[in-house]
Amino acid sequence: MEEELKNFIKLWISAIISISYCYYLSTGIKAGVFRLLSVLPVCALFLVFPLFFSYVHFSGCMAFFLSWLANFKLILFSFDQGPLSPLPRTLSRFICITCFPIKPQQNPNIQNYKIPIWLFAIKVVIFVVLLQMYEYKQYLSPALLLVFNSLHIFLELEIVFMLVKALVFITLGCDLEPQSNEPYLATSLQDFWGRRWNLMVPAILRPAVYLPARRMACRKVNSDQAMFLGVFAAFLVSGAVHEMLFFYLTREVPTGEVTWFFLLHGVCTVAEVAVKKSTFVRRWWRVSPTVSRLLTVGFVVVTSGWFFFPLIRSGIIERLASEALMCIDFVKHKFLLLLLGD
């Protein structure tokens, strides 16, 4: 654990130096191909960083924050697009916006920033109890185990982002973008993926994939068809990115299952939008919000098994649980040593 932690710190220092290079050098180069060429070596470096770890948590953090977030933002920055445009005023803000899904506040007020400690504590308690439940997984049905796996991933991400949110606010006065907006209240797939679940992803995929694909498609087809192709392209890229993230976690050749999951949802979302645009539906067919929520959430839950199969099959979920317990023991041990003065 200690060696992995030291390696984690070293690589984050390297990442900060690399992003600083992009801030000072790339800003002196006009937006376009030449700026892109100047940041591509950094993007390549960020693709390699997760491979230096054997712990799933460290590899996953590197893959998520650098290989995925930072790389997409730097590529958009090369063309004066995305969250790094206009250029942040300070290097520290540039680094944080590059690595994390943050939303800078112009006039942050610490009195308005209240971390719900009680909610955080409840999530931590549930998460710890859930970790202990893995010892009894042989007694759980596959359906219940899938629910446990989904809850485990959700809670772990929530806890990590809450900690990062507090750290970023303390250092910069910036607030993190909310990771979700009550996804269980989604009334359609378009609502779920575009406005409720993992909100930072559509915020990046829109300028990086959807808009360019739609503009190119407009040359050959009408505006509605171009919009559908743009949506489908965004889901395709999202699937490819998740395949990459799963590769870093499992170190196994991608099977394409995750990509097919996103392609399925892309096709269904496009079909849903097309149906809602039809005259008959707009005039005569009204579905109550309760029914639409049940249908939407039910479809997402049923198909989510496809998304989790690679992680379950490779034992990554169990490794995440064991590493989390090991981390808790490590912190407890260090805390006791600190108290005893040894």
Swiss-Prot record:
EC number: 2.3.1.75
UniProt record, GO biological process: lipid metabolic process
The name this protein goes by in its record: Probable long-chain-alcohol O-fatty-acyltransferase 3
Pfam annotation, one family: MBOAT_2
Cellular component aspect of the GO annotation: membrane
Subcellular location, record wording: Membrane
Lipid bilayer topology: Multi-pass membrane protein
Location (main, coarse): membrane
Keywords: Acyltransferase, Lipid biosynthesis, Lipid metabolism, Membrane, Transferase, Transmembrane, Transmembrane helix
Family designation: Belongs to the wax synthase family.
A single GO molecular function term of this UniProt record: long-chain-alcohol O-fatty-acyltransferase activity
Reaction catalysis annotation: a long chain fatty alcohol + a fatty acyl-CoA = a wax ester + CoA
Role played: Catalyzes the final step in the synthesis of long-chain linear esters (waxes).
Transmembrane segments: 9-29, 36-56, 58-78, 115-135, 153-173, 227-247, 255-275, 297-317
Domain of life: Eukaryota
Keyword Nucleotide-binding set for record: no
